[in-house]
Amino acid sequence: MNRLISVVGPSGVGKTTLVRALAQTGNFATALEQHAERPFQALFKQDQRYGLANQIDYFLFRAEQEKELRAASKIGLIDGGLDLDFHCFTRLFRSRNLLSEPEHDLCRRLYDFIRADLPRPELIVRLVADEGTVAARLSTRDRINIARAEDTALFNSFLEEWLASVPSGQVLNVDVSHERLDYKVSKRIILERVSI
C-alpha cells in the first residue's frame, strides 16, 4: 500500500494548481476533484435539494480515488479529499442550511463507514493564504463553486478544528499567500518533506 498525501485548504487557495505542479515532477500519482464530471455539482449549485446527493457522490468518488492511489506505483497525491469533504465542506453546507441535520448525520455515518476501511493520508499539506488572496483566486476560477469567498473564515475554522485532531507530525502548513502559480517554493518544501 502506497503513501497518500492530501492537499487541503479553502476553495480558491490553490489545491488543484499545486497538485498539478507537483505532478509535473513525475514523482506522484494524482487524483483531482473533477467538478465538471460530478453529476450533482451543477444541480446542487442551482437547487439545494441536490446537496445530499452531491456529498454522497463526492465521498464515494474520493474513496475510489484513494483506493486507486494506494495501489499506484508512486506516492499518491489528492487535492482536497474525503476528509476535507466531510470535515469542512459538509459542515459548511450544514451551516448554510444547504444540508439538514439528518442529512448531515447521514454524511457523518457514511464518512465514518468509509474511513473505517481506508487508512487516513500519511501527510496533510494545509495551504494557508489570507482571505483577500483566496477571494481573488476564487473569482478567476472557471468552474462551479458552491463555497464562496465569504465562507473562507468559517471554512478555515472547521479546517483548524479537524486538523487539531490529527497528529501534528502528519500536517505540513504551507503559506501560499505570495506564491507564484508555478508553486516553486511550495514544491521544494513538500518534496523535501516526503524525501524526494
Task: Provide a role label for each language-model segment.
Residues 62-102, 125:
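A basic- and aromatic-enriched beta-loop-alpha substructure that forms the phosphate/nucleotide-
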Residues 15:
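Conserved lysine of the Walker
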Residues 24-70, 88-89:
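Conserved substrate/cofactor phosphate-moiety recognition/catalytic segment
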Residues 135-196:
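NTP-dependent small-molecule kinase module
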Residues 88-158:
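A glycine- and Lys/Arg-enriched "phosphate-lid" helix/loop adjacent to the NTP-binding pocket
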Residues 7:
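Hydrophobic anchor at the beta1->P-loop junction of P-loop NTPases
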Residues 10:
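P-loop (Walker A) phosphate-binding loop of NTP-binding proteins
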Residues 18-19:
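Post-Walker A alpha-helix
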